[in-house]
């Protein structure tokens, strides 16, 4: 189950499509893709 926007994460693979894990805050942020 993937994490949605601003969901807690430890790596980008934790996040849903088009999201990446912020290394600074450890939550999922938009990666700029559609």
UniProtKB/Swiss-Prot annotation:
Keywords: Disulfide bond, Ion channel impairing toxin, Knottin, Neurotoxin, Secreted, Toxin, Voltage-gated sodium channel impairing toxin. Pfam families: Toxin_12. Expressed by the venom gland. Changing residue 17 to K: No change in ability to inhibit Nav1.2/SCN2A, 14-fold increase in ability to inhibit Nav1.5/SCN5A, and 3-fold increase in ability to inhibit Nav1.7/SCN9A. GO terms for cellular component: extracellular region. Changing residue 20 to V: 4.6-fold increase in ability to inhibit Nav1.2/SCN2A, and no change in ability to inhibit both Nav1.5/SNC5A and Nav1.7/SCN9A. The keyword Nuclease does not apply. GO terms for molecular function: ion channel inhibitor activity; sodium channel regulator activity; toxin activity. Disulfide bonds join 2-16, 9-21, 15-28. It is found in: Secreted. Negative results: the recombinant toxin does not show or very weak activity on Nav1.5/SCN5A (IC(50)>10 uM). Ion channel impairing toxin that inhibits several voltage-gated sodium channels. It acts by inhibiting the inward component of the sodium current and by shifting the voltage dependence of channel activation to more depolarized potentials. Its most potent activity is on Nav1.7/SCN9A (IC(50)=167 nM), followed by Nav1.6/SCN8A (IC(50)=696 nM), and Nav1.2/SCN2A (IC(50)=3.54 uM). Belongs to the neurotoxin 10 (Hwtx-1) family. 54 (ProTx-1) subfamily. The presence of a 'disulfide through disulfide knot' structurally defines this protein as a knottin. This is Beta/mu-theraphotoxin-Pe1b. The lineage of its organism: Eukaryota, Metazoa, Ecdysozoa, Arthropoda, Chelicerata.
């Amino acid at each position: 189950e993937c994490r949605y926007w601003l969901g807690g994460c430890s790596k980008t693979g934790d996040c849903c499509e088009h999201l990446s894990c912020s290394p600074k805050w450890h939550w999922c942020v938009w990666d700029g893709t559609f």
